[in-house]
């Protein structure tokens, strides 16, 4: 069903999945809208699982919200496998079906997935994802009659102008000097795709909580800003604190 849904836009598959997962279609739509809020989609409302308009009324969303949803979905291994599949063979007791993916962009070597769409209100819509030089990209277009070429042009421009910059290094996270904590660290490197001008406009700000006893404890956050807009929040940890030995405690220890 998932392959039929994603490769061939099977609306019948969408309804069957909704009924099975949600108990009924209406409840599944409620689940869809709840998930949209969790993902951060502020300008989206789902009215059915197929995406089709009914009596001139249908789901509504924005390119940005669809990009947020796609980023969330690409974290799922099964989803990533399905959307990059060019063709799938489905067999029943009576017949064998070969479903070819409608996403022609899969022939472009950097493409990792995506989804085509069409409704009377939105016309041609297309979401695609690509990976290049360690960077992941998402392009979303709505009402674009030449969407294939638009996506290719945008990717070529992005690949040319963006570079994956190491903003925070796990190995060399020693730029912060703080007398309260010893051995602050982060768990992962932070790479961010940026243009040259953006790379020179980043601001790093660290905010720490004062915790008395810590043992590999979350003690704060390293915020990254681009032109006054927060674009990343990196958790900061402190290794186990060691009891400080004072001069008088050393003297006292001599008489034990």
Describe every region a protein language model picked out.
Residues 41, 45, 57-256:
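Domain-terminus/edge residues, biased toward the C-terminal soluble/receptor-binding domains
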Residues 1-67:
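Active-site-adjacent loops and short helices of periplasmic peptidoglycan-processing enzymes
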């Amino acid at each position: 069903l998932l392959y039929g849904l994603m490769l061939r836009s099977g609306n019948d598959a969408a309804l069957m999945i909704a009924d099975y997962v949600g108990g009924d279609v209406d409840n599944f739509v409620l689940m869809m809208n709840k998930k949209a809020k969790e993902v951060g989609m502020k300008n989206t409302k789902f009215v059915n699982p197929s995406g089709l308009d009914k009596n001139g009324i249908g789901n509504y969303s924005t390119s940005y919200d669809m990009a947020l949803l796609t980023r969330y979905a690409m974290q799922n291994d099964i989803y990533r496998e399905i959307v990059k599949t060019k063709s799938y063979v489905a067999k029943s007791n009576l017949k064998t079906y070969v479903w070819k993916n409608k996403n022609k962009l899969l022939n472009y070597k950097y493409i990792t997935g995506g989804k085509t769409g069409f409704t009377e209100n939105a016309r041609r819509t297309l979401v695609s994802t690509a990976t290049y030089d360690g960077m992941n990209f998402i392009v979303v277009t709505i009402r674009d009659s030449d969407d294939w070429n638009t996506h290719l042009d945008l990717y070529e421009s992005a690949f040319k102008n963006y570079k994956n910059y190491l903003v925070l290094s796990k190995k060399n996270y020693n730029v912060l000097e703080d007398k309260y904590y010893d051995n602050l660290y982060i768990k992962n490197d932070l790479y961010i795709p940026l243009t040259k001008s953006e790379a020179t406009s980043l601001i790093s700000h660290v905010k720490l909580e004062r915790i008395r006893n810590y043992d590999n404890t979350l003690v704060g956050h390293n915020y990254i800003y681009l032109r006054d807009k927060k674009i990343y929040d990196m958790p900061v940890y402190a290794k186990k604190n060691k009891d400080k030995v004072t001069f008088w405690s050393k003297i006292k220890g001599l008489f034990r």
